[in-house]
């Protein structure tokens, strides 16, 4: 399963999620909303693409610059709906030192240690970071990656029986390409991963890029990060099929 998650906030939050039973992995890649993608004959920030044309067009734009599986889905969810879904799992314990400096954390009342944070507080914190023009897009995206990483690590055992069903219950408020068959596949994949005898490879990173003059653009490092995200060699990246669940 490969899904582009879009949190439909004032500044949208984007995370690529790749769950693969065959590779026993959950890989998460936070994509900065400022990343410039092709849209309307020019390059615009992914957030602007979302505002103009929605999540399906964002998935298409990312697929034009990266070797995404052809069956990559999208899931756009409002912050209030996401907060309600995530609240059932309780607070997650997150460390933000890999994303933000001690000074930046202090500005938001956060310490350098691992701390518990509720779904609502996590959303408020990430929204504030997105609005902070003194931070590079990579900093705020890295904080988002840290939250999602903590969530999947700490809630994995509960996800097979709760996450797909939770999405079904709020399906009327989602913008998504996920079908009933896709949700059943997600459920089976999560069940396999949650009960795996081997440690699940859970990683969460931020998509690198060139940040200069107020523009965050695709670089060789960006493409290499996407190849690594899908566990692909450079040669295989051009033929990513997404045939695994």
Predicted regions and their residues:
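Flexible, solvent-exposed short loops/turns enriched in glycine
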Residues: 24-54, 98-112
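C-terminal solvent-exposed extensions
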Residues: 10, 27, 35-42, 173-245
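Second-shell loop/turn segments in exported
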Residues: 44-53, 65-73, 130-139, 155-159, ...
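Extracytoplasmic
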Residues: 9-14, 23-31, 57, 69, ...
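Flexible, polar/acidic helix-loop-strand segments at domain edges
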Residues: 87-169
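Entry/capping segment at the start of metal-dependent catalytic domains
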Residues: 1-29, 127, 190, 225-226, ...
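Extracytoplasmic/secreted envelope proteins and their assembly/folding machinery
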Residues: 13, 55-63, 79-87, 123-126, ...
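Amphipathic, coiled-coil-like alpha-helical scaffolding segments used for oligomerization/assembly
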Residues: 51-111
């Amino acid at each position: 399963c490969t899904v582009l998650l879009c949190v439909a906030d004032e500044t949208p939050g984007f995370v690529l999620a790749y769950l693969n039973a065959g590779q026993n992995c959950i890989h998460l890649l936070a994509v900065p909303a400022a990343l410039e993608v092709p849209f309307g004959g020019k390059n615009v920030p992914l957030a602007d693409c979302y505002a103009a044309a929605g999540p399906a067009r964002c998935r298409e734009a990312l697929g034009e610059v990266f070797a995404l599986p052809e069956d990559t889905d999208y899931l756009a969810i409002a912050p209030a709906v996401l907060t309600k879904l995530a609240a059932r799992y309780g607070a997650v314990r997150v460390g933000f030192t890999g994303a933000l400096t001690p000074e930046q954390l202090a500005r938001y009342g956060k310490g350098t240690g691992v701390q518990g944070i509720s779904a609502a507080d996590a959303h408020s914190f990430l929204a504030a970071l997105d609005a902070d023009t003194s931070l590079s897009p990579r900093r705020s995206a890295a904080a988002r990656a840290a939250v999602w990483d903590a969530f999947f690590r700490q809630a994995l055992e509960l996800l097979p029986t709760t996450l797909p069903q939770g999405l079904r219950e709020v399906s009327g408020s989602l913008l998504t390409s996920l079908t009933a068959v896709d949700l059943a596949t997600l459920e089976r994949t999560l069940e396999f991963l949650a009960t795996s005898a081997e440690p699940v490879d859970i990683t969460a990173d931020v998509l690198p890029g060139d940040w200069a003059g107020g523009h965050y653009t695709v670089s060789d490092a960006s493409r290499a990060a996407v190849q690594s995200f899908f566990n692909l060699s450079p040669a295989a990246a051009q033929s990513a099929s997404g045939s695994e669940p």
